[in-house]
């Protein structure tokens, strides 16, 4: 199999809010849209945001959503500060293996900033 492009499909309940979050807050470039889904560039892959998911007012626990959307950045603290200015609550944590900045999207899906490998 020769992979042409990879993608992630994110089923959402708060569809419009999630589009705004990923497009405007995280600056993922717009690719295309239909009434039921929106596709944004996700580095060399794509993030397809679709209707039909279930939201949570708090961060979903792992058995509700065992996936984390990871955004590798040059500097976690700087990226976290940029998101905070836009109103995104980011918790920066340091581990022996690196630094992350954890936050959630409008549906309660966990996302993380990560320093380079």
Predicted regions and their residues:
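N-terminal beta-strand motif that seeds the catalytic metal site of vicinal oxygen chelate
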Residues: 1-19, 67-69
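Short beta-strand micro-motifs in enzyme catalytic cores
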Residues: 38, 67, 99-101
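Short secondary-structure junctions
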Residues: 27-33, 88-92
């Amino acid at each position: 199999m020769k992979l042409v492009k990879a993608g992630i499909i994110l089923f959402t309940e708060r569809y419009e809010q999630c589009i705004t979050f990923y497009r405007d807050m995280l600056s993922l470039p717009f690719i295309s849209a239909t009434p039921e889904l929106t596709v944004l560039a996700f580095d060399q892959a794509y993030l397809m945001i679709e209707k039909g998911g279930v939201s949570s007012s708090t961060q979903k626990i792992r058995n509700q959503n065992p996936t984390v959307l990871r955004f590798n950045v040059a500097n976690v603290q700087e990226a976290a500060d940029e998101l905070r200015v836009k109103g995104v609550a980011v918790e920066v944590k340091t581990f022996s293996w690196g630094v992350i900045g954890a936050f959630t999207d409008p549906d309660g899906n966990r996302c993380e900033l990560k320093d380079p490998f």
